[in-house]
Amino acid sequence: MIAEANAPDRTAPVRRWATYREYLATADDTRIVEWADGEIIEYMPPLIEHQDLAGFLLQLIGAFVARFNLGKVMIAPTEVKLWPEGPSREPDIFFVPTADLSNFDPWRFNGAPDLVVEVVSPGSVREDRVRKFTEYELAGVREYWLVDPRPHQRTVECYRRDAAGVFAPVDVTEDGRLCSAVLIHAGAPFWLHVDWLWQEPLPKVEAALQQILDSGEQLS
């Protein structure tokens, strides 16, 4: 489990006790609202940097997944019911392989996605790094990425489910790549240069995807 203090911030989520039924009546498609441990967690609108990063990752991962027909990539606010009677989260990005697409119903995904990506906001630190970390691990998420763009952080962390069902940290390669064990085609993994996320402006999705595809061809 990752622990970090979360100082008061205007982006801190609003919390109130509620049943799951009350959560369903509150949630909509215009804001991120989650339900865990008997409380509704309503998040403030994210910062522009958060949305820029989430949008870049969604497009890049989505393009790779679509090119090889690997499954489905979703973005918040989409409910993920991690287990029956368990928490309902709305990850910034999540990936579901083709074999698990039947776990979608018209309103939500039921179960653990293979990949979850959360972009940390000042008000979501404890949720992303402690509570969700534990929930995703228990639910069986195979890979969890934490992208923290805060100026004093600027980190990307990857945790991968090991044989014991526990999240284990994954190091980036010597040249700064984060390689996925979940997003793979013909033995070649999806990867990204961590430095891409801190470039201004962010790289063009098409150019980044081509680098990924070119490296895969070299491995084949």
Where in the sequence are the language-model features?
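Gly/Pro/Ser/Thr-rich low-complexity, intrinsically disordered segments predominantly at protein N-termini
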Residues: 1-220
